[in-house]
UniProtKB/Swiss-Prot annotation:
Family: Belongs to the methylglyoxal synthase family.
Active-site residues, as the UniProt record annotates them: 69 (proton donor/acceptor)
Gene Ontology molecular function, alphabetical: methylglyoxal synthase activity
Domain MGS-like: 4-147
Lineage of the organism: Bacteria, Pseudomonadati, Spirochaetota, Spirochaetia, Leptospirales
EC category: lyase
Pfam families per record: MGS
Catalytic activity field: dihydroxyacetone phosphate = methylglyoxal + phosphate
InterPro entries tied to this protein: Methylgl_synth, Methylglyoxal_synth_AS, MGS-like_dom, MGS-like_dom_sf
Any one Gene Ontology BP term: methylglyoxal biosynthetic process
Entry-linked SMART domains: MGS
Gene from which this protein is expressed: mgsA
Record protein name field: Methylglyoxal synthase
Amino acid sequence: MKEVSVPATKRIALVAHDNRKEDLVSWVKAHREILSKHRLFGTGTTGKLISEETGLPVTRFLSGPLGGDQQIGAKIAEGDLDIVVFFWDPLTAQPHDPDVKALLRIAVLYNVPMACNRSTADYMISSPQFTISYEKVLLNFELLCES
């Protein structure tokens, strides 16, 4: 096991499927003041929508179906994202479902908190750890891969 420092200014990925985009924008608006103190990232359409609706700067990746979910997963693996808020639609099959599953897997693997609904996102953003630096524990993957 090893500890990795998560900075007080979090790097937060914001992602939503089409049927959940309005809900995510509403959540961001409700927490705009807190989120303005952090660095925001998003997939193409979601990031654009959040930026337009809230005035917050959002660094944008590709749209989810075009590889944006995979780009976010890569940033997690590189240690460049600290939190994921992903409002996904559990009732609609997505053409990029394997990418979504891969993103969930990478977030768990690298111990990155992920909120998949508004209640969990509310709990996360109200946590004392949200605004301070935090030491998270990671498995030592090199040792696991050698066995």
